Amino acid sequence: MGAARGSPARPRRLPLLSVLLLPLLGGTQTAIVFIKQPSSQDALQGRRALLRCEVEAPGPVHVYWLLDGAPVQDTERRFAQGSSLSFAAVDRLQDSGTFQCVARDDVTGEEARSANASFNIKWIEAGPVVLKHPASEAEIQPQTQVTLRCHIDGHPRPTYQWFRDGTPLSDGQSNHTVSSKERNLTLRPAGPEHSGLYSCCAHSAFGQACSSQNFTLSIADESFARVVLAPQDVVVARYEEAMFHCQFSAQPPPSLQWLFEDETPITNRSRPPHLRRATVFANGSLLLTQVRPRNAGIYRCIGQGQRGPPIILEATLHLAEIEDMPLFEPRVFTAGSEERVTCLPPKGLPEPSVWWEHAGVRLPTHGRVYQKGHELVLANIAESDAGVYTCHAANLAGQRRQDVNITVATVPSWLKKPQDSQLEEGKPGYLDCLTQATPKPTVVWYRNQMLISEDSRFEVFKNGTLRINSVEVYDGTWYRCMSSTPAGSIEAQARVQVLEKLKFTPPPQPQQCMEFDKEATVPCSATGREKPTIKWERADGSSLPEWVTDNAGTLHFARVTRDDAGNYTCIASNGPQGQIRAHVQLTVAVFITFKVEPERTTVYQGHTALLQCEAQGDPKPLIQWKGKDRILDPTKLGPRMHIFQNGSLVIHDVAPEDSGRYTCIAGNSCNIKHTEAPLYVVDKPVPEESEGPGSPPPYKMIQTIGLSVGAAVAYIIAVLGLMFYCKKRCKAKRLQKQPEGEEPEMECLNGGPLQNGQPSAEIQEEVALTSLGSGPAATNKRHSTSDKMHFPRSSLQPITTLGKSEFGEVFLAKAQGLEEGVAETLVLVKSLQSKDEQQQLDFRRELEMFGKLNHANVVRLLGLCREAEPHYMVLEYVDLGDLKQFLRISKSKDEKLKSQPLSTKQKVALCTQVALGMEHLSNNRFVHKDLAARNCLVSAQRQVKVSALGLSKDVYNSEYYHFRQAWVPLRWMSPEAILEGDFSTKSDVWAFGVLMWEVFTHGEMPHGGQADDEVLADLQAGKARLPQPEGCPSKLYRLMQRCWALSPKDRPSFSEIASALGDSTVDSKP
């Protein structure tokens, strides 16, 4: 340790015990370090908050939280996310106190605690207006002091405003005083003119609240009019009479006047035209006869005493009405159960009375089948209870009725069970499952315990029979049918044996080529119910030459001669099925070789370029040229280009746009070969007018330029060739898994399309990303997106950190001037803090993807900040945050937190929007790779947008699995994606099925009861299936199962998914 400042440096002696203990203490010092500690912060009552905590330790640690020293238990409102503590809605009572993050090493027992943190919670809460002085209302007398208190409280302290009969009371008036500190209103002295309804409101930085219960102050004065009898609302049928009663008292007696809505006075001498049948009696009552619709409205009775304000009493005259009743859905009940059917009364005035009838007889209020309130109750249901029941509703306006058809279900019984069957390959096959029941039973089929969904191969008839449209060998397995009604189900199974047809596997190609004077083989294989015998013979019946052997179906030529050409027949035969033949025409050819190949050529602009190419072979090859990714058609070349008979290409008057790679393609009926070379068009140097004796000759200058250009081009070609080779190997591996004719899937998050089957644009993209290009063209390509989307970093105002992704921090910010006419825009910002080259490349690919997509259900790229480190990607954000949190909140039991519950129709709408966004993404040949509820955003209008937050480092760390040196979303990944790294649109479809499951379970963790290793083992075994969520329609669960088909070919496209969900939206009930 250094000496203290200002004192001479001298050795410091330590006691021997201290010297011995220092190494020990150093060795036992805790290895747990807090990278980020929680800090005290402001919070709003009922809003979200996050206490961040990040630790670093050599081994696994257990992180938990304390509140005032007691462990914090996870709830729907307050729960751990990674090592941080998340609050879905801050509560001032439950969250007041000191929080502390604790990290414990369960192996060593070491423990570290963070600094204390707490919330400064801002809130406001409504309360009543109460009488403070005098002690009770009975003690209030004229000319006494009256004090009222407003029981609205909050933090910070709010300001108060008092009202009498809805009119604000200003401070400083002589007849009352207001004390904001005490929240009091004092009336001194109080008189009859102070009578009225007193209320208060309070304002603070958190918001506004008004009194939950108001105070009515009534100070009597004999000269003031007082209510004796107030008019009541009246409902009458058309053309009937209506009577309103109204009386006041005062000394001296008060005056009384009636007004209709338009403020027209009603008297016996002067009646308005629309109230000619109105009569006012001496006691103040108003009679209306033969009421019509124009008489309906508000009637006011006004009493005025000698002193005091007038008293206005209102009553409304309604005409009786009744609406139609909603339709009943047919009901199916099971025998022996108890069921209820509710009849909701139609809207009407007065409220209609409701009763049930069956077979024209009104149901009693007790018994086995009876009416209770508005409900039809059927106890211990019998089959005889089936039939039509009628609900009646009636009031003064008339009567309505609606029927409900009740069916009593029975358990299905067998008419014909499925039988073990032998089905012929290639022909239709049928399995019967005939049952009867009430109502008509539903039949489903299972193949190897997997539900059979109808597609091009399977069809289930209305009677339950299963048709296999074209039986294949692998259809030989167990089949099970289940017939069910609400009363129960029955099932049976049968074994299918496929009678394999005699066939070639695969059929030999009808035309094949063999290279002259080389060894060659022509295979022929076949299968059948019995192993077939395979032999070859010449089509003319002649025997095979001695140098040609037939070995178990393989025709082997030791050395191909011209005489070996001709027609051959492969014959496969067995006893039960006879024989089949395949004819093959063999051609002997000399395979193509290039006598002259085109070379790299540099030509001055305006001169003539010659690219030589000559090929030989038998049959004689035809030569074509491809330039700049298009075939050069000799009939459309124009006057500048010409292809000679020997295959050479000449270009006259070359221009800069002629620069590029030219490919010479030689082909005949047996094979195709190609070779290519670059053409460079350069400007001719202008000679100086006077050259000194030391100036180099012109040919020397050209030689220097040629060498420089040649060296640069050679370097670029070498690097591009290496990249092309690596990518071609990767693509070839993926293409092997795809059916013939299907275009290979594009690289994940890469926008470059395939050109003529070659990934040329993709190579160019890689060049831009890895800075291989050094010229202006490469620089312009690399910065095209960033220049167009540049946004100044100084215009971003960070709000809060959402979490950490593989790239770096993800946070919310306000962007100033981002959109025209909008001062500030709420945006999501992803930062690139990683120095890993692969992650930098992924970051670039992600911004390219969002920059190119334009769809209402995909977030937009709004800007880029790349003028300094770290780089920022500015993305669109919507107000409710990610879909995962939205789903979890929707099922919360906390009344302060819970939003409106989601109906099935709304859940389907959420899934449909994600499917439409992914359809747009896949149509543009992008692959997401991390589709999940956590990576979708949702607005208050429940609009969903596909995004890529990727908070794998903290908030959603538990949803990622460390596999092969990377963090992957294991529980959302298809088998081929996790086991082979084969990501495609079909692996995104698998993840979409899991997202649908998340929506219908309100954000539960997929495979929540299993450890990550168990989920991985199930994926490897092909058994990873999620159960049907509670309340999820079977039709939608079948769609999920289609998304989880083991073969990517059997999974639907996003267009099919969007269409199926659109149909389900129509069918779904709230």
Swiss-Prot record:
Protein origin, superkingdom: Eukaryota
Residues at the site labelled Cleavage: P621, L622
Region of interest: Interaction with CTNNB1: 794-1070
Cysteine disulfide partners in this protein: C53-C101, C150-C200, C246-C301, C343-C391, C433-C481, C524-C570, C613-C664
Sites of Phosphoserine modification: S1064
Function, in words: Inactive tyrosine kinase involved in Wnt signaling pathway. Component of both the non-canonical (also known as the Wnt/planar cell polarity signaling) and the canonical Wnt signaling pathway. Functions in cell adhesion, cell migration, cell polarity, proliferation, actin cytoskeleton reorganization and apoptosis. Has a role in embryogenesis, epithelial tissue organization and angiogenesis.
Entry's free-text remark on domains: The protein kinase domain is predicted to be catalytically inactive.
Name of protein: Inactive tyrosine-protein kinase 7
Gene name in the database record: PTK7
